Design a protein with these regions (language model features):
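N-terminal signal peptide c-region/cleavage motif recognized by signal peptidases
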Residues: 16-20
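Early extracytoplasmic/lumenal segment of secretory-pathway proteins
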Residues: 23-86, 332
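A ligand-binding cleft/hinge motif common to bilobed small-molecule-binding domains
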Residues: 83-87, 211-233
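Periplasmic-binding protein-like
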Residues: 124, 152-159, 185-188, 192-195, 231-257, 271-294
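An extracytoplasmic/periplasmic, membrane-proximal ligand-sensing/linker region
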Residues: 178-179, 286-332
Length: 332
């Protein structure tokens, strides 16, 4: 009889243990791999939940998620931009997040998901990087629109395949109108130098191939940390005064409605918004933490001084229209 009781107790303990064992999760990752690796490793260390990262461009992953629908193997979508969330939210593929999770990164200027089904996590600023040996700050324009003019013929680099570039087109369209955005794109094609990546455009400025380029801030800060700011040939210019050239773009995350591991997925997104999660991210990447109690170790321009326009993609149509304009201008 004692043996029987022992067996039942052992079985009950095994069932109880299996019931609390956390499932592993799969993250479709459009964020930079270095940043994603840092936060997932910190999350696993904190919770014991293992994370599989499937990485590609955010827009590509969003398209894949729409095709997969509720049958997706993904639990979380971690995007470098917020624009892809609009399409997925409208398709009903995202799970609402708790108010406690969302409020961790909410403050003035940070985009809010209309259905509370994704969260902004970190920001990066659009900037002009320029060759300090050829240009000075007084040569810089007060609006990003003015870099697409004949004055800058062969003097300005740009990266039309960048997700942040797409969001800048959305910002120009919303703030200045569709025709202005199209004229800007055509002007860049006519007068600018096209590069495949932001890092390549930055290196072109460093090497003296082009005097200036439109990029994201963190590429320059990473290079400055690696080589030393005094060793660089380039400097950053911040356009400010709510111009679309001062745009801050945001990374974010969402739990997929088709996730088979929603509890663990929500824990992961909550961790990304937590102090530990934000600290893990900004330790390796010069992005702005959205928690006010986390400070970046990079010597970045203060977030409060960026004077960014409060504009972002809120519908799938915003993204679709921007892509059409880029294509119409002959840049796709």
């Amino acid at each position: 009889m004692k043996i029987r009781h022992f067996q039942l107790a052992t079985l009950a303990a095994a069932i109880a243990f299996s019931g609390i064992a956390a499932a592993d999760i799969t993250v479709y990752n459009g964020q930079h791999k270095e940043a994603a690796k840092a936060v997932t490793e910190a999350f696993t260390k904190e919770t014991g939940i293992k994370v599989t990262l499937n990485s590609a461009k955010s827009e590509q992953l969003a398209g894949q998620l729409k095709e997969e629908g509720d049958k997706t193997p993904a639990d979380v979508f971690y995007s470098e931009q917020t624009a892809p969330f609009a399409m997925l939210s409208e398709a009903g593929l995202l799970e609402p997040l708790s108010a406690d999770t969302i409020k961790q990164t909410q403050h003035k200027g940070v985009p809010v998901a209309p259905k509370k089904d994704w969260i902004a996590l970190s920001g990066r600023s659009r900037v002009v990087v320029y060759d300090k040996n050829k240009l000075s700050e007084k040569d810089m324009e007060k609006s990003v629109l003015d870099y697409a003019t004949p004055k800058w013929k062969d003097k300005i680099g740009y990266v039309p395949t960048s997700g942040a570039f797409l969001e800048q087109v959305i910002a120009i369209t919303k703030l200045k109108g569709e025709q202005v955005a199209l004229n800007w794109l055509k002007g860049l094609k006519e007068n600018g130098k096209l590069y495949a990546k932001n890092s390549v455009a930055l290196q072109a400025v460093e090497n003296g191939e082009v005097p200036a380029a439109l990029i994201n801030n963190y590429y320059w800060y990473a290079l400055a940390k690696e080589k030393g700011e005094d060793k660089l040939n380039s400097r950053l210019y911040f356009i400010r005064h709510q111009d679309p050239g001062a745009l801050v773009t945001y990374s974010g995350a969402a739990v997929l409605k088709g996730s088979k591991n929603k509890e663990e997925a929500k824990k992961f997104v909550d961790f990304l918004a937590s102090k530990k999660g934000q600290e893990a991210l900004v330790a390796v990447r010069a992005e702005y933490p959205l928690r006010t109690d986390v400070v970046s170790p990079f010597n970045m321009e203060p977030y409060a001084k960026l004077e960014a326009p409060e504009v972002s993609a809120t519908t799938a149509q915003d993204k679709e229209n921007a892509n059409k304009l880029i294509e119409q201008a002959g840049l796709k």
